[in-house]
Amino acid sequence: MTADDGVPIYYTDRGEGDPIFLIHGWTMNHKFFQHNIPELSRTHRVVTMDIRGHGRSGKQELNMSLRQAAKDARAVIEHLSLDRVTIAGWSMGTSLIFHYFDLFGGERLKGAVFIDMTPRLVNDGGWEHGVFGTLDYAAAYALERDIFEDRLTVEEALIPACFKDGEAPDEETVEWWIGESMLTPTGVMAAFWTSMVAHDWREQLPRTPVPVLLCYGARSALYPTELGALLDERIPQSELVVFEESGHSPFWEEPEKFNREIARFAG
């Protein structure tokens, strides 16, 4: 599929039934849902999309923002004539969903799934639920600089943080994750980091237009605070499911439980 600005957008479409639309995280791609698509597609129609600049989508570095990515997601939904979609976003994928709500409300959606993500990445005196519970604007800008100066070192630090207690399960998994992540151009990585840092969606939470399933890891290194419980309080139609043996990636760390919960929620 081609987006409205000419950038090719890669998607997959498998199974039949009520649609589930899986959106990956920062620098990742649809392959990260390899433990979920086969099982979920037994009972649902499962769609994935590689966000522009990621995976097999176009790398033109044109309009590399989450707002445009949300428009791309809407275009995929329209292209496939989907309705009553359960849209699930992991990490940055949840940020994309916030932009979707801002642009389109709950149009074409039945529900949403937030997977271990914050409405505001940066911490300050009044907010401790951002990245690591400590990342401030100075650190956010420093990370953008480091992405350009020594990207591999950044990847080697961030990838283990995606697992429980900040410890990757094995070297082979880390190598695969880094290899797939490095397919995203460095300029794209930096652009989407800036796009995430620039937005604060806390005020939108009480106006969330659809029911939300909150999937949060009890042992998340990226979000070590009680973020899931906080969002459960602020989002009117929400349900919190805590993954006791997961960090930032419950769909990978506890796939059977994740698949069961998201299938139940999607109906």
Region locations from a protein language model:
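Alpha/beta-hydrolase fold catalytic core
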Residues: 1-21, 42-45, 82-83, 110, ...
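Alpha/beta-hydrolase active-site loop signature
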Residues: 27, 51-55, 94, 119, ...
